[in-house]
Design a protein with these regions (language model features):
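Long, contiguous binding/interaction regions
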Residues: 1-49, 56-184
């Protein structure tokens, strides 16, 4: 059997209540688990961007999911990508015990080597943030865990932009505008 591959779907929609539920329902019906989900305003006014990751064995299933999402009336555009086609980042947040960090200088060195930043320090805890790839964020977590200093840990969902010069949604919107103008 073929190995599972991580796919990233970039979905653009109008900011309409209930569209998130409609999009996730497509995955549920096809029994595909969403690994991560990030929703935010896009660079296009009035359009929101959904970055969704899911593991699957079969690219054809991901194509079907993408097409079903794109059929939703409030969805402007949906596309799927592999990691090679995207510039990807996540954010990891770590709350560490300040007394433990102060007792062991190796923890501070580890944070600096990972290019993480200490963003808050008080007598009880210090907050650390790291922006990077999933592996970097989880590797830092496991390294810090060995020092028994982690009080809390979380990482964001993936955010991504395509490596192409123009996103497909821009081409699609330009085409829609040309069609609209040609009908006048």
């Amino acid at each position: 059997m073929e190995d599972k591959k991580l796919y990233t779907l970039l979905v653009y929609s109008e900011n309409i209540a209930g569209i998130l539920n409609q999009i996730t329902a497509v995955f549920t019906r096809r029994q595909v688990n969403i690994e991560s989900l990030n929703v935010s305003a896009s660079s296009i006014p009035g359009v929101h961007k959904y970055t969704i990751t899911a593991w699957h064995y079969d690219e054809r299933e991901i194509i079907k999911i993408t097409r079903q999402i794109e059929k939703k009336i409030d969805v402007v555009k949906a596309s799927y990508y592999t990691d090679e086609q995207l510039f990807i980042r996540e954010v990891g947040l770590y709350k560490l015990s300040t007394p433990v960090v102060l007792e062991n200088s190796e923890i501070s060195r580890l944070i600096r080597r990972a290019d993480a930043q200490i963003v808050e320090v008080n007598p009880t805890y210090c907050s650390v943030v790291l922006s990077g790839m999933t592996e970097d964020i989880t590797n830092l977590y496991y390294a810090l865990e060995k020092f028994d200093c982690v009080l809390q840990y979380t990482r964001s969902g993936r955010i991504a932009i395509t490596r192409s010069t123009v996103e497909q949604v821009s081409d699609f919107l330009d085409m829609q505008e040309r069609n609209r103008l040609s009908k006048k």
